[in-house]
A protein has these predicted regions:
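Ribosome-associated RNA-binding proteins
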Residues: 1-210
Length: 210
C-alpha cells in the first residue's frame, strides 16, 4: 500500500494532523505560513500525495558496541521532494534494511522544508524559479558547501549527491563549491540541505512568490 493510499486509515495524533485530515489546512505552504511543526509524516503524504517522490542516496553499515557485543545496523539516507519547491532529507538506522529505509523516509518527511527559488544570476535575469535568488552556505561536520545562482541552461554544477537533492527541490541550474570530506555522503547531503534551509530562513514567508 502506497502512503497516499493509506491516508483514509490514518488516525492523526496531533492537532495539525487533524486540521489536515479534516481539510482545514490544504497545503504545506499554509503550515509554514503559520510556523507550525510537522510531527507526523502522514501530513506530508496527505498534502503532496502522488507528487511526493523519494530516492535513497546512501546505504552504509554502522557498528555499535553494547554489553551484548558488537551490533551491526544499516544506516540509510533518503531524500524526498515534489521537484517543485519542497524537499526533505532523512536518516534511518535499523538491523533490517527495509526498516531502516522506512525510518529514513519518515524522517525525511518530518524534515521537509520549502525551497527559496528564483533567478539570482546577473547573467540571466529571467525571473523564473530555476535557480536560487542569492548565494548561500551550508555546513555539516567537516563539509562546507556554497550554492550560487546560475543562468538558465547551466545545469547542476555540483557533486552527484547534491544534484539529487537539488533536483528533488525543483532547482535545475546552480554553481556550487565545497570543501571538507565530501566523500562522506551523509555530511555532504546534510550540508547541501542546510544551505537550502538557510536560503529559506533568509527571507520572510510573506516574500514567497516575489
Amino acid at each position: 500500500m502506497q502512503p497516499y493510499e493509506a491516508i483514509e486509515e490514518w488516525k492523526p495524533r496531533t492537532r495539525l494532523g487533524w486540521l489536515v485530515k479534516e481539510g482545514k489546512i490544504g497545503s504545506l505552504k499554509e503550515i509554514f505560513d503559520m510556523n507550525m511543526r510537522i510531527k507526523e509524516p502522514e501530513i506530508v503524504d496527505a498534502l503532496l500525495g502522488r507528487e511526493l517522490q523519494h530516492e535513497i542516496i546512501d546505504i552504509n553499515m554502522v557498528q555499535k558496541m553494547t554489553d551484548a557485543g558488537r551490533i551491526t545496523r544499516f544506516r540509510v539516507v533518503v531524500v524526498v521532494g515534489n521537484q517543485n519547491g519542497f524537499v526533505g532529507l532523512g536518516v534511518g538506522k535499523a538491523r533490517q534494511l527495509r526498516i531502516a529505509v522506512d525510518k529514513a523516509l519518515a524522517d525525511a518527511k518530518l524534515n521537509i522544508i520549502p525551497v527559496r527559488r528564483g533567478c539570482g544570476s546577473f547573467e540571466c535575469g529571467c525571473s523564473e524559479p530555476h535557480s536560487i535568488p542569492y548565494q548561500v552556505r551550508g555546513k555539516a561536520g567537516s563539509v562546507d558547501v556554497v550554492l550560487k545562482p546560475a543562468p538558465k541552461g547551466t545545469g547542476l554544477v555540483a557533486g552527484d549527491t547534491a544534484k539529487v537533492i537539488l533536483r528533488y527541490a525543483g532547482i535545475s541550474d546552480i554553481w556550487s563549491w565545497s570543501r571538507g570530506k565530501t566523500s562522506t555522503t551523509i555530511n555532504f547531503a546534510q550540508a547541501v540541505f542546510d544551505a537550502l534551509r538557510r536560503a529559506y530562513r533568509f527571507v520572510s514567508v510573506s516574500e514567497w512568490g516575489r
